[in-house]
Regions:
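Divalent metal-coordination and catalytic microenvironments
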Residues: 7, 44, 117
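A charged helix-plus-loop insertion that forms the helical arch/lid used to bind
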Residues: 78-94
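Buried hydrophobic packing segments
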Residues: 50-57, 177, 195-203, 296, ...
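Positively charged, low-complexity intrinsically disordered leader regions
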Residues: 1-32
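Divalent-metal (Mg2+/Mn2+/Ca2+)-assisted nucleotide/phosphate chemistry catalytic cores
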Residues: 10, 89-90, 96-217, 221
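N-terminal catalytic cores of NTP/NDP-binding nucleotidyl/phosphoryl-transfer enzymes
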Residues: 21-78, 186-193
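Short acidic, glycine/serine/threonine-rich loops at helix termini
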Residues: 76-80, 127-133, 225-231
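Conserved nucleotide- and phosphate/pyrophosphate-binding catalytic cores
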Residues: 203-406
């Protein structure tokens, strides 16, 4: 099986511009880039598809370029957005880019020029605006740009001229790296297709040469929602933002209908093994979820942390909640208490288990909250400093555990 056949069989390929892509990546002759706009100080589980694809292609001899969007982040990509992104300072962007690099090195080998990490701020921030309009802007049709899917959602609610330039900036990135780094291919999410075509067309019109693009399937659940978030919050690769235990639990708790797709797309397990696992049913699906969670946690946090997270999760599910060393935790202070105690509703909000007292109240009334294995009988229940000093474990629903101590 060729490399392209494998990534196709894993469901990673959405669409390609030309069949030449197949020969290039199969023969290790692709120098390709994927862009990362550094809008936060950590990558998320949503970046997994891109990171694992870069690793697969590098293992086959292709050369990845991880492009940090230090310049484009100052504009903000409107793709898939209904609002304008928050503007970041140069200092914020530089800090976020440094964090990205540290995390990417767990997936990609940057030694001896096997991969490059570039920052488009190095060329975009020095561009002369008039020259850009004349040399690059003349290659773009406003009519075609307005028909692009990446702008479609924003047209009714308002698209700033700043954001309208994003396609030109991303296209210029490809054009620049084609000239200076021999980059002949761009990969990205399926929602980036219009922007990527802009780059291939710019190279063709300015240089008379061919460049290629391939979009990666978006990681969505069985309901079509993007994966990589839990309770509305991103699942981060930074252990200080999402602990290895929380990260493990996110993947351990994927639905039965999503687990095999995630294993196929995200892990490096052989396809033959995955095909055999696809026949598993009922309780064996839980085993598949453990395999998924362990493999991905190992990839991001290392085998030792993955084993700790798995052992902690197994202990919790077996009822041994006292073994809670690696679960999410909240440390209270005396200032959090009122007259030496704290109510369950306030406690749940402080622990991030509910967005408000009202939500916490509903969970308690519905019988969905346990403390140290005992169902919380009423929303008026409170806990003393003495109880909290020993530590308590709150269980929300069937799968969410949180340790609270004073």
């Amino acid at each position: 099986m060729t490399l392209y056949e494998e990534i196709k069989a894993r469901g990673l390929v959405a669409q390609i511009t030309d069949d030449e892509i197949i020969d290039l990546i199969n023969n290790g002759k692709a120098t390709f880039y994927i862009g990362f706009d550094c809008t936060a100080d950590s990558l998320t589980a949503g970046h997994f598809m891109a990171l694992t694809l870069m690793k697969r292609l590098q293992m086959a001899g292709n050369k990845p370029i991880a492009l940090i969007g230090g310049g484009t982040t100052m504009i903000g990509d409107p793709s898939g957005r209904t609002d304008m992104r928050k503007m970041l300072t140069k200092e914020d962007i530089a800090h976020n880019a440094a964090c990205f690099k540290k995390q990417m090195e767990k997936f990609i080998d940057f030694s001896d020029g096997k991969a490059l990490m570039l920052n488009n701020a190095d060329w975009l921030l020095n561009l002369n605006y008039v020259e850009l309009l004349r040399d690059v802007g003349a290659c773009f049709s406003v009519n075609n740009m307005l028909r692009a899917k990446c702008y479609e959602q924003r047209m009714e609610k308002g698209l700033s001229f700043l954001e309208f330039n994003y396609m030109i900036m991303q296209s210029y990135d490809f054009y620049y790296m084609f000239q200076h780094y021999g980059c002949n291919m761009q990969f990205g999410g399926d929602d980036q297709w219009s922007n990527m075509l802009g780059g291939t067309e710019l190279i063709r019109r300015k240089l008379g040469k061919d460049a290629y693009a391939m979009t990666i399937t978006l990681l969505t659940d069985s309901q079509g929602k993007k994966m990589g978030k839990t309770a509305g919050n991103a699942v981060w690769l930074d252990p200080n933002k999402t602990s290895p235990f929380e990260f493990y639990q996110y993947w351990r708790n994927v639905s039965d209908s999503d687990v095999m797709k995630c294993i196929r797309m995200l892990t490096f397990l052989p396809l033959e093994q995955i095909d055999e696992m696809s026949t598993w049913k009922d309780q064996r699906l839980n085993e598949a979820k453990e395999i998924l969670a362990f493999e991905l946690t190992k990839m991001v946090h290392g085998e030792e942390e993955a084993a700790k997270a798995q052992n902690a999760a197994r202990a919790l599910f077996s009822g041994a909640a006292g073994d809670a060393e690696h679960m999410p935790n909240t440390q209270l202070t005396e200032a959090d208490l009122t007259d030496g105690s704290i109510g369950i509703l306030t406690l749940m909000v402080k622990a991030g288990l509910a967005a408000s007292n009202g939500e916490a109240r509903r969970l308690v009334v519905q019988g969905g909250v346990l403390v140290d294995g005992e169902k919380v009988a009423a929303p008026t229940v409170s806990f003393t400093a003495e109880q909290l000093s020993k530590g308590i474990v709150i269980k929300k629903g069937k799968k969410v555990y949180h340790k609270v101590s004073l």
